[in-house]
């Protein structure tokens, strides 16, 4: 055996065969990765709140989790980890409803839909998820032209250049809702009330007050339909069955081996 453990296993479709083999163990946990349909809030027509709301209702999260991640992942309705005690479940606010999506597009002045770009980085959740989302958007009249990019291209065109309509990426930094307070960030969301809330949060030490602020922050970005909130990325690992002490969850992007040992 050349490999004894593989943290962050990239092929969820292969996990059942490992789980069925007594030589291996499969660990399924959670990450800090909010997987989102990132939306360029300054690029028409996504500068229109009604269009972003239509986009949200055009998306069937569970179909994406099932099709792209083979069932691994937790639906989210805002940019916050469901395992965090301050998480607010807002998934119902953007529930899948293709007829409502069509109605909202018509209200926004796009009864025939529109065309946009969907630029996808390499991870399978993005490539597979992108195909599923493109089909879901097509069903309500939105034609999303897919471009598959390598990471350097994605960083240049999308993250730095902001030359995109839509993209899919998992934001794996812990507790990073404060990125929505940066108007220059790649989804270009500019809300002074949210920015003030994040400043107040930074200056607040009382736990109850901070919790209330974080819940308000989640609600603001959900109400503004800044991005399409898809799912919390699952932590998937495969290891030799005799290994103990591996982390099931991934609270950071590190693979912690300090407690790892072999069973006798």
Regions found by a protein language model. Give the residues of each.
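Short helices/loops that flank or line small-molecule/ion binding pockets
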Residues: 1-4, 16-21, 49-50, 131-140, ...
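Extracellular/periplasmic solute-recognition and catalytic clefts
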Residues: 1-43, 152, 170
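A local structural motif
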Residues: 2, 23, 111-118, 135-149
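Short, well-ordered beta-strand segments
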Residues: 6, 117-119, 167
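Short helix-initiation/N-cap motifs at beta->coil->alpha
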Residues: 9-13, 122-124, 146-156
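Detector for C-terminal structural segments
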Residues: 35, 56-88, 125-134, 152-264
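Structural transition elements
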Residues: 40, 46, 74-107, 125-128
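Short, hydrophobic beta-strand segments
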Residues: 40-42, 88-89, 112-121
